[in-house]
Every structure is written in structure tokens, then in C-alpha cells.
């Protein structure tokens, strides 16, 4: 009897060892399949390995316990420690999972699921902020040609600060960096100056205008504010906005002047001219070139503009003038779809050796336009006026004064805009109010002086004197009286010319305050 029990115990031990060998073989096969990357296996490898390891852990203490005697040999109940339970577990685990994976998936991070990564910036872009590294397009670029802060800017605020209060600075706006760079290179090459640098937004360092100012200016101190009892002082007024239009040169003016004299109406139906003996003025219809309108406006060579409803033709005129036209369309006429006109009276520029001396002054009338009947443009004889531009400026100045004084005869006027050198008005259904009348008188007193062209012009002075005396007023010019006293003390053969040009080397003296009667100003 004891021999039978020993044999049965030996049988159980051998069965356990056999099961252990089978488990090792299965584990070795699983590892070999994972290393070879077999794609034909569709099973949950981690679950099986976990089951095998749990079985091995159970077999670790190789100690067999005696089982109770059975009714018949070989009819024992199933041993729960046998490895035969592994296939059942594997099948149950496999049915629980919907997605089948391969062993190679477990060697990859995140079980083979790719995680989207952020795209790296293009390595071709240079790290520095040079012109080639501009990735985002800007609406405009500004070239400041000269002055202490010359350069190419991509920010309106920096460029405006670089030009405010700087006399004689030249600047212009461009749509692209390529155009701005080309214009800057042309200027620096002609002036034999250094190449202008590109100054991005935030990197502009505006220095004092001169070393003298830097030495004499005291260092700024931070204001110390008290919580109570001290009123915070108001900030300094913002500087006047500077338009980014390059100053009209004498060559530009002579080109436009000659273009108007030679224009015969062929090739462009958006422009026609009004001609007289000495000058031809442009009239612009719908769809005219807005850049040409701007150049002609700055040269004082426009008579009339007939803009479209969207006002695209005048988009490059000064902002306040455009705003005045928009307000007239929306507030002063019932049908906003009606065509309008801008009738302009202007002086022309005057130059001296140092540059532009006088910018044109403008009186603009806005009104509702009827059917346009353009006059036939005629090619006129063009003369070289480079030597007698002062005479031409004097004639246009006298005509400008006459048109400004005619406002005194109009009783129904609405003033749309009053600036230092521009007056915009329109006809009104009501009588002119006192506020508008004062605005007109103030503009007349500021503009109608012998210094209308930027210097004391005897011809303008005599014209004002004749006009005022014709109206029954009194006029006296201190500058002319002083000149007469000098002439009386001079020798008999000395003569005084009726026309004088602008001073070429001396500073331009300030505008004289001429005495006029109340009738002269309306």
C-alpha cells in the first residue's frame, strides 16, 4: 500500500515537471516570435505572458501535497494548478479585446499609436530679423530717406516718430519691402550715402536730433505720484500727424506742368485739361489714377475731381480732406448715390536752394455734380519755366486770393474743414452761421498776406493793396514802407525791382502782419 502511494506521488511530481517544461517551451516560442516580428500571430501576448509567469510563480516552491484517496485510480478531479488552464484564459482574454495587435506593437512606444507632433519652423528662414526673414506680409513700409533716423520701417508709429519735428526730412510709403528697398537704394546711390537699414517694429531707437540737444537736455526722471493731494499733470499733446508723401521736387513739378501743356486728350479718357496762356490744370473723372491725382494735388495743378461713389480716386489725398468729403456725402445730401465734384483753387510750390520753401494752399468746394461735359484738351506751347517759376507762382497766388475773397459774396456756405493751408466748404440751404463766417475770416487773415508764397513778394503785396483799396479799405505793409525808406536814402541810380524771388542763402523771415480793414475780410 505504501508503494502505491509513493508511485502516485511520483506521478504527480513528474506531471508538474512536465507542465513546467511545457510552459517554458511556450514562453520560449512566444519570445522567438516577438524577435522575428511574425505578423501571423493574433493574440494578446502580454496577457499570456502574465498568465505563464503567474503559473511559474505558483510552481516556485516545489512541494507537493497529498491529495485525498479517490474512488478509482486516474479519476481525480482536475488540478487547479495545471497549466492546462492557460489556453482557456487566453481565449477569454482574446474575446474581450476588439482590436488584435502583433507582438511588434509592444516594442514600440505608446503601443504603436503615433502621436501627432508640431511641425518645426522652416530652417531656411534666417534667425535674424533681416528683410529676407520677413514671414508675415505688412500692409505698408515707410522709407525715411534722410534725417537723423533714416531707414526703412514696417511700423507706422516708429516711422512717424522718426519724422515728426525734423525739418526737411523726405519720406514715402510703399506697399512691399521690395519697392521700399529699391527706392531707398536709388536715393542713397544718387546721394552717395550709406545704404539705409531695415528697422523692424520694436527695434527703432530714436536718438536726439543732435549731440548738443543730448548734452543740454536734463535726464528724464520718473514721476512720483502720491495717492492723495497731488493732481496728475496732463500728458504732452500728441505731435501733428505727418503725411508720408515725399515732397514735390522742382523736377516733379516741371514734369507735370509740361505733361498738362502737351496733353491733347488722346490715350486717356479719365483726364482732360483746362488751358490758358500760362498754365494747364488737370480735371479728373471716374476711375482716374489716384496716384496721379495725389501728385497733381501736391503740385497745385488740379481744377476739378469727379470721384466715384467709393471715392477711390481721392484715397491718397490728405486724410482730413477725405473725411470731409465722406461727411458731405453722408450728412449734407439726401441721395448718397449722387455724383459729387471737388472744385479746387491752389497756389503752386516755390523752391529755394535748400529745398521746398512753400507748399500749395488749397480752397476746395464740394458739391453735387450734374452731367459732365468735358472740354476738349488742346496741346499748348510748353516753355521752360524753371527760370521764371516765381512769376508763374505770383499769378496763381493772385488768382487764389481772388477766389478766396469771393467767398465774402456768398451768403449760404457751410464750412466742412479748416486747416492751416486748406479750406473746404460747400453750399448750404441756410444762411452762413457766425461760426463758419469766423472760420472763413480767420483763414483769410492768415493766408492773404505778402508772404503767401513763403517769402515777401512785392507783387502779391501790391495786389492785396489794390484789392483792399478798391473795396474802400486801408492797407499798409511795414515791409514795403521799410523798403521805401531805404530807397530814398540810396543813390539816384539805384533801382528796386518789382518782383523779388525767395531768399537763397538767408533765413526766410516770419510772415508780416499786414493791416487790413474789416471790408477786406468780409
From Swiss-Prot:
A GO CC term assigned to this protein in UniProt: host cell cytoplasm
A Pfam family: Cauli_VI
Protein location: Host cytoplasm
GO biological process: regulation of translation
Role, per record: Enhances the ribosomal termination-reinitiation event leading to the translation of major open reading frames on the polycistronic viral RNAs.
Regions of compositional bias (Polar residues) in chain numbering: 111-126
Name of the protein described by the UniProt record: Transactivator/viroplasmin protein
Organism: Cauliflower mosaic virus (strain Bari 1) (CaMV)
Residue numbers spanned by region Disordered: 111-133, 491-522
